[in-house]
Amino acid sequence: MEDGRFRADLPFFGGKAILKPNGKEGNANSAIIEKLAEVGGLLARGKIKHSYPHSWRSKAPVIYRNTPQWFAAVDKPVNDGLDAYGKTIRERALTSIDELVTWTPPTGRNRLHSMIEARPDWVLSRQRAWGVPLTCFTKNGSLPADDDYLLRNSVVNARVLEAFEVEGADAWYMDGAKERFLSGIVEPEGYTQVFDILDVWFDSGSTHAFVLRDRDDGSDDGMADLYLEGTDQHRGWFHSSMLQSCGTQGRAPYRGVLTHGFTLDEKGMKMSKSIGNTVSPDDVTKQYGADILRLWVAQSDYTSDLRIGPEILKGVADSYRRLRNTMGFMLGSLADFS
């Protein structure tokens, strides 16, 4: 439970504390060990020193708990008639990666393909104080596997949409929201309002819909010519956009993906103000002039991580002087040339 105890109805260990409020070990572990010994199921006991996860806020030990969540099934047929690239989200994504999208550099294809090929279902829900709500209702007494567990009603959806367009997502959290959206359609007392929020990557992954498709100045087919971001977005924006578009449009939301590396210091370390290894473009141009910075960019391979620092800039400045002196000599030698 939320207080660090087993549920009261759990046989043998109901109500026992795994962790106490002060973060100290409760009586649950010792009770489990004693029960295992009692039934002859304990192979060995002892103490070992090992790392253990702690909260970054409170610094107290944490407990991993299984909690009910909402998922998007990547291997379940979507049944929307958009089967040109496959019947499931995974099939559509993998086919789009191979047949529809151009990857720059080509290695980007392998990264996203391997991730989607091996990924589990997408966990859509989060339990947070604020965010984009899932905006759904579940029927009391039904189980998740039942057809009527999730309320599917176009009139209810229209009411929610209208409220959000005027009041924003806060409309979902107002007092009486359930009665407002359900009254006159179904009995509000028969349903539970879900207050889970969406994964933020679902939020960012929907940009193809409201930037490209649902605007007068969007693209004709709702697809982007190019998505451009850093290499970390194979796991992020490229990934979530692909899954969501394959679930709603039947194919990728983009025709091309260009991936760039990151700018690091000259030792290959991530820049950090606390470490003091940042390089300001303004400082570079003040010391060397803009052409040195332009030349560093021009001679760098953007498809991999870029390094910059005092010694590297000195080398670029030397190259620039050689180029300038050589070109000056060549231009001077052209006098009276015909």
Protein language model annotation of sequence segments:
Residues 1-144, 149, 269, 275-319, ...:
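Residue patterns forming the tRNA-binding/recognition surfaces of aminoacyl-tRNA synthetases
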Residues 335-338:
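Conserved nucleotide- and phosphate/pyrophosphate-binding catalytic cores
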Residues 1-4, 128-130, 151-305:
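Alpha-helical recognition segments enriched in aromatics with Gly/Pro capping
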